Every structure is written in structure tokens, then in C-alpha cells.
Amino acid sequence: MKKILVVEDEESLRLFYEEELKAEGYDILTARNGREAIRQLETGKPDLIILDIVMPVMDGMETLGRIVGQERKIPVILNTSYSGYRQDFMSWAADAYVTKSHDLTELKRKIRELLEKGKGQ
């Protein structure tokens, strides 16, 4: 079973993503901010990371930089309400960029695509 780390500070969205992705057959880890996400990487390696950008403690861009420096083989999907970050240089380090929606069709498609692609191979 593929393991996905969902990094999202809004509890209702984090629980929604967890429920929806578990129904798709994924094992889900969650983190409320970048610092928790980095801790999760130290204890268990997910197959993919879904990363919010605007979060307290450690934002998504700083978290992305640390992930890229430590675990480049793990694909990262930036998932945000703010489309302006798409042009941010640091966002180019992510494998995909998906605008948040309660319709997870696009997010699920990107997850399947990246997991099937087998990053780093």
C-alpha cells in the first residue's frame, strides 16, 4: 500500500483529504505544518507528499526546500488556494502544483500519475 504524507494546517481539509485518499486505498500520514512534516520524514518515508504552502511554524516553501535537500526521490505535490505561488521559483522544485478544491479529481489524478511514474527511476 502506497503511503502519502498530507501536510495541511486546516484540520477540516486535512481530515477530508485523509478520508478521501484512504478510500482510494492509500495509507495516510498527516502533519499540521512543515516542522511536523520533517519529523514524519525522519520516522517513516512516504511514497508521496501533498504539501500546503501557507502554514504556521514552517511554511510550505521552506518545507519544500528541506525535503528537496533530504529526500529528492519523494515526489511532492504543492496544494494551495493561492495560484500566485505557481510562478515562485521555489515551487519549480515540486513535481506538481494543484489548486485546492473540494473536488479532488485533479489531485487524485496527479497522485496516480506521480506514483506510477516512479520518480527517480
Language model features with spans:
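Active-site residues of response regulator receiver
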Residues: 52
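Two-component/phosphorelay signaling modules centered on CheY-like receiver
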Residues: 11-29
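Receiver (REC) domain active-site loop signature in two-component systems and cognate sites
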Residues: 55
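Alpha4 helix (beta4-alpha4-beta5 surface) of REC/receiver domains from two-component response regulators
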Residues: 62, 83-109
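Hydrophobic/aromatic residues positioned on beta-strands within the core alpha/beta folds
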Residues: 77-79
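Acidic catalytic/metal-coordinating carboxylates
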Residues: 33-36, 59-62
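Conserved acidic carboxylate
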Residues: 8
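C-terminal output helix
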Residues: 18, 102-115, 119
